[in-house]
C-alpha cells in the first residue's frame, strides 16, 4: 500500500495518524510533496511550529514581519531558514554523489534519530520502520534552498537528487507487487 500525502497535512494535525499507519504496518511506502515532508514534518521535528492564520492576510504585511504563508498557515521565516541550513548541513555530511529523494530522506531520518527536538515525526517513524518515503518534487520545498546552499558551498563535490532513478525505483516496486493500492 502506498500512502500519498499532499498539502499542509502536518499543520492540519494528520501526521500522527500517518505515523500510526507506519507503526501498525499498514503502509509499505509513502509518496509525498516536499511541503508535506520538509516544510511541515521535518520543520516541526526540528522544534519549530506552524500557526493557524488567514488566507486573506496581506502578504506584504506578513513579509514585513518575516512571516511566510502557506494558504492559511504561517511559518516564521527565520525558522524556515534554520530548516534550510539543517538540510544543507545534512547534505554536507554525505558522500558527494547522486541520491534519490528516498535515500536523502532516509538520511534525514537518521539525523532526526539523534537530533530531533520533537520526537515521532513521520520521517523518523518511517526511518525506524524501514518504510521508504519518495518525494518526486523534493526541491519544491524548503529543501531546495538547503540543497542550493550545499551546492554553492561545494561547487565541485556535492550531492544531487536523481529523480529519474527514483521514478525507476517507484516503478519497480509497483511492477514487482502482485497487488498494490493507494491510500490518499
Q: Which positions does each model-derived feature cover?
A:
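Conserved catalytic alpha/beta core of Sir2/sirtuin-type deacylases, generalized to analogous enzyme cores
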Residues: 1-5, 10-183
Amino acid at each position: 500500500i502506498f500512502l500519498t500525502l499532499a498539502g499542509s497535512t502536518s499543520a492540519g494535525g494528520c501526521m500522527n495518524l500517518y505515523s500510526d499507519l507506519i507503526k501498525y504496518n499498514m503502509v509499505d511506502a509513502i509518496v509525498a510533496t516536499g511541503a508535506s515532508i520538509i516544510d511541515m514534518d521535518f520543520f516541526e521535528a526540528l522544534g519549530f511550529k506552524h500557526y493557524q492564520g488567514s488566507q486573506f492576510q496581506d502578504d506584504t504585511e506578513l513579509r514585513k514581519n518575516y512571516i511566510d504563508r502557506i494558504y492559511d498557515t504561517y511559518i516564521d521565516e527565520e525558522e524556515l531558514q534554520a530548516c534550510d541550513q539543517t538540510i544543507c548541513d545534512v547534505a554536507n555530511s554525505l558522500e558527494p554523489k547522486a541520491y534519490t529523494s528516498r535515500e536523502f530522506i532516509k538520511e534525514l531520518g537518521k539525523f532526526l534519530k539523534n537530533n530531533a527536538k520533537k520526537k515521532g515525526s513521520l520521517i523518523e517513524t518511517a526511518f525506524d520502520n524501514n518504510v521508504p518515503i519518495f518525494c518526486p518534487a523534493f526541491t519544491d520545498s524548503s529543501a531546495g534552498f538547503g540543497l542550493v546552499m550545499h551546492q554553492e558551498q561545494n561547487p565541485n563535490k556535492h550531492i544531487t537528487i536523481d529523480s529519474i532513478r527514483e521514478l525507476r525505483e517507484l516503478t519497480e516496486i509497483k511492477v514487482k507487487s502482485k497487488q498494490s493500492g493507494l491510500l490518499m
